[in-house]
Amino acid sequence: MMTSDSPLLRIEDLVLHFKTSKGSVRAVDGVNFGLDFNEAVVVLGESGCGKTSLARAILRLLPRNVEDFSGRVFLNGKNVMAYKDEEFRQKVRWQQMSFVPQAAMNSLNPVLKVGDQVAEPLIFTRGVSKQEAMQQARHMFQLVGVPEGFLQRYAFELSGGMRQRAAIAMALVTTPELVILDEPTSALDVLTQANIFNVLKHIKENMETSYILITHDIATSSELAQKVAVMYAGQMVEISDAPSFFHMPLHPYSQKLLNSVPRLHGDKEPDFIVGQPPSLLSPPTGCRFKARCPFRFEKCEQEPPTFMKDGRLVKCWLHA
């Protein structure tokens, strides 16, 4: 049995490459990071950097064109990458880990009542009766702030915010230790986004659930983050506790990301990152951010290792 001092999740050298007509897409390319019990990690990065592929690699929700899938994923100290697909489905996915996919509110079945959909994972993974599953779904609705009467409604009868809450309830109904959320507020208005993050904080406090939150919404995610992982071109370039990251990020890419966020106070205008991210079909040698980095020097032609600085991890020669 794992202790509270042991990490809930530890990822080592995780690789996920896709085969396409143009070549191999290196979506996740040697990722390492971890997550403690009852901890919220926010994964930041531009669109196309591999964040969603990382989530699907952890959950083993893979398309047919996978070319390379390797590495180690330890959950409660067990390497679940060693599990066969059926064993992983029965013991891990929707049992210990669950997923709220991007645009989840649009993934609800329009011809089934919302309550039946929320209860379904519990029926299939735990074998409980529909009555028991509906009771748990009712409890989850209360937890995420959805009126009990909405159990008998269809998805098209709910607002976008309520559908998103229902999707979160579905991910929580089996009481997993880890929930991975992929852009859970991307299609919602600002007020609804704030309400969803308040729901997530409330759940974390009441259920002691750990989160991996994938987003490019830096400002809103800072309300929930305890740890921040920054992804660029398929690699983790910085991992830090949230207060240190938002006060003084270490990696040049992280600095540019924070400088792109509009400020309510002061006269400083948002900055932008010059250039385009590299293609994951043929990422450059050396540092993958070097073409856009204002601090580039000769050493950047070599692949930087991950350095430890003040308890934080950064993949940059500036901190050698």
Residue locations for each model-derived region?
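Conserved ABC transporter NBD signature motif
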Residues: 67-79
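ABC ATPase NBD coupling module
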Residues: 79-98, 124, 244-249, 279-284
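Short catalytic/signature loops enriched in Gly
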Residues: 239-320
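A short, proline-enriched helix->beta-strand linker immediately N-terminal to the Walker B motif
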Residues: 173-177
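P-loop NTP-binding/switch modules centered on Walker-like glycine-rich loops
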Residues: 180, 184-268
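Conserved ABC ATPase "signature" region
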Residues: 79, 131-149, 258
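Conserved ABC ATPase signature
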Residues: 154-158, 162
